[in-house]
């Protein structure tokens, strides 16, 4: 008769050497997975760098093509090339600055100012961008802003004779002319006040009943005032007396006794 006994665990049958082999294989698989992850990250980084480098090269190619078109005065086509380049490298301040110059040649002042502002925003240390911005602002008549832009450009590159002799000097000359024109305009402007020109005086009908009645009332009042005159007489003792006298037959008191004051 077979005796009853507890079943042994399966793991107890696995030898120690076999267990170590399993652990080693698991570690190798883990290292391989980590290596694969690392390789994937490195490969992704390399692909990104390659893509960026390709974008830069293509952008530079489009920039050069646009510059060639601009030299041949094919401005619209040049702008299209630079817009394509900006899609690849949106942080390139030079593209915005070149685009602003071409827009100035096309007399599109507002877009030119906007493009120059974008160039300054991308690279505030570019004196070319500040110079182009100042010229675009002059095109809009913003002389004060243009002078400020030229001064910033000179602060970055103080040895540039073009900024001194052409840009800043011309802007200041325009500013002086603007001040003279304003002074002349202020002198020629008529003073504010009621308009007394002949055209502003209403044409009254002096033979109307209303005007005749008013004139008669004024004449009657003047007649009554001239008929009676009032005199204030102050005696030597200081007594004040008011006397109404007629125009005809009036007599003046003795000057030795009274002092007459009107």
Swiss-Prot record:
The modification Phosphoserine is found at residue 197. It comes from the Eukaryota. TPR repeats lie at residues 59-92, 93-126, 127-160. Residues 17-63 are annotated as: Disordered. InterPro entries: TPR-containing, TPR-like_helical_dom_sf, TPR_rpt. PROSITE patterns: TPR (PS50005), TPR_REGION (PS50293). Keywords: Phosphoprotein, Repeat, TPR repeat. PANTHER family: OSMOSIS RESPONSIVE FACTOR, TETRATRICOPEPTIDE REPEAT PROTEIN 33. This is Tetratricopeptide repeat protein 33. It comes from Mus musculus (Mouse). The lineage of its organism: Eukaryota, Metazoa, Chordata, Craniata, Vertebrata. The gene is Ttc33.
